[in-house]
Amino acid sequence: MANENHGSPREEASLLSHSPGTSNQSQPCSPKPIRLVQDLPEELVHAGWEKCWSRRENRPYYFNRFTNQSLWEMPVLGQHDVISDPLGLNATPLPQDSSLVETPPAENKPRKRQLSEEQPSGNGVKKPKIEIPVTPTGQSVPSSPSIPGTPTLKMWGTSPEDKQQAALLRPTEVYWDLDIQTNAVIKHRGPSEVLPPHPEVELLRSQLILKLRQHYRELCQQREGIEPPRESFNRWMLERKVVDKGSDPLLPSNCEPVVSPSMFREIMNDIPIRLSRIKFREEAKRLLFKYAEAARRLIESRSASPDSRKVVKWNVEDTFSWLRKDHSASKEDYMDRLEHLRRQCGPHVSAAAKDSVEGICSKIYHISLEYVKRIREKHLAILKENNISEEVEAPEVEPRLVYCYPVRLAVSAPPMPSVEMHMENNVVCIRYKGEMVKVSRNYFSKLWLLYRYSCIDDSAFERFLPRVWCLLRRYQMMFGVGLYEGTGLQGSLPVHVFEALHRLFGVSFECFASPLNCYFRQYCSAFPDTDGYFGSRGPCLDFAPLSGSFEANPPFCEELMDAMVSHFERLLESSPEPLSFIVFIPEWREPPTPALTRMEQSRFKRHQLILPAFEHEYRSGSQHICKKEEMHYKAVHNTAVLFLQNDPGFAKWAPTPERLQELSAAYRQSGRSHSSGSSSSSSSEAKDRDSGREQGPSREPHPT
């Protein structure tokens, strides 16, 4: 049921205008719920339950002042209390039907019908006995977004203007659907051992990451005479976390090998100079001259074999001679000559620079290792000050099947410091110790809803703003603070496509998302510590569903995409239940990425769809703060859509021609026209901006 004690969304203005200390006689008072004679058992009263009267429905209901949960029926004794038993370990197990999936009490209300529920499975596999995890149902989850009462808002310490408070939680544009329930089934798991986030720790981490980025820039400039390859530091962090076994959620500290293949490859591809795309003949001529000059300078300044020096110098002199003689060459002639020079000199130049580039990669890793130690010491000191132990006895986990639920942390969260918040037009600004992060009003409302759905240790929202600050700061530092930096690594599919995926293939879960760019309220993300409070199920590579339909749009990091394919194939191989992954990755062919090649050859591949470049869109990775006209951008490369399904998954969510046609039609609906009818994306300036955002990793360049 909707939160009866809070009223409906239509009543939000009157409810929010009534708060102690701000109401006056000229303001209308909100109707207070009538408290009935409390004839409840003493156990329920101690648990926070009381009996109230609904004027709208003209019947009694039961309200929990601790969790804000409302029920029509009297609460059942034996259900777990989220305060004393947040994980529900001592809860009385609910009776289960071996052939049916039960629905939790908080979800026994009308909700949207899902196509995946209406269609027969099409296979004879017996449905598993699936229990609903008690942890995420400790709080009532409304079937539609509703605005809470003033008392909750007042506990945030926000502006005293009640109308402004109401506006914060009333989105004007919505790019998500948090009503969709999950069909992802997992084995019940224990809480995560990562330490809970704290603004003081996050502030130190962000300062050290900025220093590490600066170290990387200086090493590239001083040792190789180049600027750091675009997004290479961001992809280094993504690639390192695939193999990292360290304690920090962001910085690597325990990796093998020490030299990152991703960082090494991208720096080497920019040596001796970065080859950019050219349009005109004179640009091609200058590029050829710069490459020859840089190759000669590098081979003379490094220790190289006499044969290597001879080959490079001879080819460089031959190129200079050709440039002096031929004044009628076309753009294609210059590019052919450049390609010939790269083939002749490239191996020798790379061999001469190899030790230096490995030194850069090793140096950055060891600096990161020292920074992680400092962050860890700071974090443990804060926990010790609050008498919180990092050593928590792991609870016993029952081996049962449950619907997926957000990550829970084993270590208790320490008290949070105060965080300031103010509004600038439609932007919410949150400040801690002079460091400010920003998020649009619409996405602030989204974070509030996700927090309300997922968080179980802060029913009064006293820690909401500090946790939002930590979340925004974490993603800001992960992808950099430059213009459009990192936005391509956080891009997501348009709303129309998500709607089609859910309607046609029963998709209800994103494998690579964040609280900021997710469409569903169930998703995997990079950071279980900051994101778990907002619905994250943890990192995708640690998430092991037994059944369900999933969308996967990974960051464009080759090592991460390759690890994703291995993970998906293991899951499809081991599960007898319907399991489906719809994967969206760039169609890079020169050379092809291992992930794309493996999926095309996989026995689980049921279909492959190619979306042409500049004929489909992504939503910006900075959608939570960017302008409306920049919300969507054209993809500058083809996108491959691959359907990986086991046999039961194929029988249930088969990519039939009719469904594929509808999915392609969804891509033809431009999100730009949806969000801004007056903006135009056909200009060359817009294409250049999109290209900057969508920049892939430095691969073998083809500057044509």
Curated annotation (Swiss-Prot):
SUPFAM superfamilies given for it? WW domain (SSF51045)
> Could you say how this protein's activity is regulated?
Cap-specific adenosine methyltransferase activity is inhibited by zinc.
Catalysed reactions listed for this entry: a 5'-end (N(7)-methyl 5'-triphosphoguanosine)-(2'-O-methyladenosine) in mRNA + S-adenosyl-L-methionine = a 5'-end (N(7)-methyl 5'-triphosphoguanosine)-(N(6),2'-O-dimethyladenosine) in mRNA + S-adenosyl-L-homocysteine + H(+)
Tissue-wise, where is it found? Ubiquitous.
The Polar residues compositionally biased stretches are: 16-29, 136-149
Quote the record's binding site residues for substrate. 235, 265, 558, 588-592
Residues recorded as bearing Phosphothreonine in the entry: 152
Per UniProt, S-adenosyl-L-methionine binds at 553-556, 614-616
**A single GO cellular-component term on record:** nucleoplasm
Q: Where in the cell is it found?
A: Nucleus
Question: PANTHER family from the entry?
Answer: MRNA (2'-O-METHYLADENOSINE-N(6)-)-METHYLTRANSFERASE, PHOSPHORYLATED CTD INTERACTING FACTOR 1
- Cited function: Cap-specific adenosine methyltransferase that catalyzes formation of N(6),2'-O-dimethyladenosine cap (m6A(m)) by methylating the adenosine at the second transcribed position of capped mRNAs. Recruited to the early elongation complex of RNA polymerase II (RNAPII) via interaction with POLR2A and mediates formation of m6A(m) co-transcriptionally.
Q: Give the protein's recorded name.
A: mRNA (2'-O-methyladenosine-N(6)-)-methyltransferase
Species whose genome carries this gene = Homo sapiens (Human)
Which gene name belongs to this protein?
PCIF1
